[in-house]
Amino acid sequence: MVLSQQRTGSWHIYLINVIARSDSDETISFIVLGIASSGEALLGMTEGGHMKLDAALPPSGLKDVPAIAKAAEEIGFDALWTQETLHDPFLPCALIAEHTTHLNFGTAVAVSFARSPANIAYTAWDLAAQSNGRFILGLGTQVRAHIERRFGQPWPESPVKKLREQIEVIRAFWDCWQNGTKLNYRGEYYKITLMSPFFQPSPLTSPPAPLLKKRGALIPIYIAGVNTGLAKLAGELCEGFHVHPFHSPRYLKEVMLPAIEEGAKKTNRKREDVSVSVTAFVATTPEEMNFARAQISFYASTPSYRPVMDLHGWSGVAEKLSAHASKGEWAEMPMLITDEMLSEFCLVTKEDKLASELKKRYDGIADRLTLYTPFVPRERDEWWRKTIQPFNA
């Protein structure tokens, strides 16, 4: 479903939200940023604790990736994220690695249940090697309908448990390849015991970043989730967690961060050991406010996102939005998002104050920030530079 179309110079930007629902407590939604032409920082916070500003790669085709990646690096983004929507998420990463020198990059996210752990492990290994350690592996479960009916794979009884095993198997492959450890993983979903020299890649030669080395990790793994189940898993096992754009700072502080911390305690870790990567709505013009209001109304209509609305006492509004959505009454929905709601889910500010207000809003919450606004080279380049500069100071 296309919610909006914006024109920026010579580009048309289509913002599409694809949401699927399941009976589990985890629902993943992807933002499709479709673009058509008309004419040591891997973990987020460094040892010094700086918040990083990243960009999302619009899925406009592989031929556009080198130019976008070079521009993102030149302007000063810390990382560039790919998505699995219109295109494969890993192929652009190979081009980003080839055409940049210091830009971090990764998947946000690749659908894990559509692939075997071996597929993921080999691809991530090659990207880490090609980029001298700049690749971040981001995984998400997707939902039952897409896994079964689009990817043709079985849906697990416990998505969280299967993702846990996938991560453990991926790391077992990496440990085998790097350290010669015998491959012998036996779980409920996977039994992986075979690795012969003919199929074993060479060890990585680039040393891991200090924070990764301290944690015994070779390649950082982030996972994405909407509710608390996967947030707990991220806290327990992963280097990072991708936060959905439909959130409020209060929801993150009171619900998601405690869940990450709860998971971290199981493995004697702290919340600070997990990089929290947040995609944020921002609006500096009336047009951007209207756009954000429309997007937020659509997210708020989704039953799986109800806890976000419930926390703020807006359950009744969420029910009305769901009723409108079920009837396809999209035009009526944005009017139900009050200014108070908008300010909770979107940073509304003046353009010259955006960077400082972002840092204030997400201080103590986010280690990485990606704006919902798509990055398009040669369109608003100076605006991006001014926004990024305080994050890189």
Regions found by a protein language model. Give the residues of each.
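N-terminal, intrinsically disordered charge-dense segments
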Residues: 1-13
